[in-house]
Amino acid sequence: FYLEYHHRQELSKIQNACIILISKQEMKLRLIDYKGQEIFCAPVATGKNVGDKRKQGDMRTPEGVFQVSDIQRATDWKHDFGDGKGEIDGAYGDFFIRLLVPGHKGIGIHGTHLPESIGTRASEGCIRMYNEDLKKLVSLIYPPLTVVVTPGIEDEVANHL
């Protein structure tokens, strides 16, 4: 009985396993299940500057393999983009999916108050999504999910300069 129970438990873990793939080339986020099937896809915005993140404030989205460390409610969060408009309510949408990025803090996947920015390089380094897409994604994931961010062609060029 124990082995059968243990086997069912392990199989359940595998069947619930997913990975998030973010392509800076395509400006897309995909949620892939353990069989390699795409179960969710949405457009995103990434960092304003091309290339892999090097330091805090460089406006680049980090590339590599990371983990979701936490999913936080961000409904009441504000952010000052330094554009003279002051703190903006709802800048992050309803949620902030915090990523564990070695050497960097404050990187995550979140919503936006600027839906027109989706599909472009517009963020300070985070991955932005439409707020509706973010809500759907949050309903499908949990920590410590693996997140892979792949570079685009422009990023590869910048990374080798």
Model feature map: region roles:
Residues 2-107, 157:
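Gly/Pro-biased beta-strand-loop elements
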